[in-house]
Structure formats: C-alpha cells, structure tokens
Amino acid sequence: MLDHNEYPTVSGDYPLTDEWAVTLPSTFQTKIEDEDLVIWKSGLTIWCSVWDIDYGETQQDAMAWVVEEQAEKAFDVHQTEKDGLIFYRYRLFEETNDYSVASVYCFVFSHSSYIQLGIYVDDEADYAQAIEICESMTFINMAVLH
C-alpha cells in the first residue's frame, strides 16, 4: 500500500528478507537507501542490514567480531538467546540525534546470517518500543544450513 508520500506502509509481522522478519507495533513507511532497508515513522527510524555468516564460522564467531568492533562509548549492553538465535544489543549517543537520545543497535545471529537494526529515536519515551522491535526479530528460513 502506498501513502500520499509514495512510500509503502507496513505493520505487524513484516518479512525483511527471505530469512528475517520483524513485528512492527504500528504503521511504518519503508524505502531502500544506500542498499539498506529503512523503516520509519515519526520519531523512530530503523536501518536494517544483513550479512552472511561464512561457512565454518559460528554465531559466536560472528558476534565476537561485532563486540570487538562496537563503539567504545557503547552502554546498556545486553545479550540473550531465544529459539536458537543470539540477540545482542547496546545503546550509543550519536551526532545523528544531537547526542540527546541514545540510539539502539540490535544484532540477531542465526546459524547462517545476522541482521543489524540501527534504531534511532527522537524521544527517550520511545526506547521501550525500540527494544520491543529488537526482541520481535525472527529467523524464518530454518532450511538454510551450512
């Protein structure tokens, strides 16, 4: 469905790729920018990037690289496992939003790929919704095996 701005609108369970899906708590708009999927609504923007995990590499190997490369000023670091997936996230104050509200970086690792969600909120009150979106990620192509 296209809105007045000619961007598709999505809500609820939404497949991001052939392998990954997210549950969106309300209506968002979508577009492709710089080869990434961008999902947004007023006050909240999500940038989605997906990478393959190399043959012979494990979820833990891929996550170790992300942890090693994360910004030094990352805080509120959280890791959990659910349904065979590893969820890893942290927050970071950035120039993007004038250092006023910390962004949320969420990574979810399957056996064959991982997805990064960079979630930018304009108001701290939207932080809970950003976490809800991170935790809703699902891997929908369990047939992909190394």
Residues covered by each model-derived region:
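Short, compositionally biased strand/turn segments
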Residues: 1-13, 54
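Short, hydrophobic/aromatic-rich segments at coil-to-beta transitions
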Residues: 7-12, 35, 82-91
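Signature of long, low-cysteine stretches enriched in small and polar/charged residues
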Residues: 66-112, 120
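Short, flexible beta-strand-to-coil junctions
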Residues: 42-45, 51-56, 93-97, 109-112, ...
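Secretory pathway targeting signatures of secreted, lumenal, and periplasmic proteins
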Residues: 13-65
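Short glycine-aromatic motifs
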Residues: 9, 27-29, 71-77, 87, ...
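Surface-exposed amphipathic alpha-helical segments
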Residues: 26-28, 117-146
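General beta-strand recognition
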Residues: 38, 47, 89, 115-116
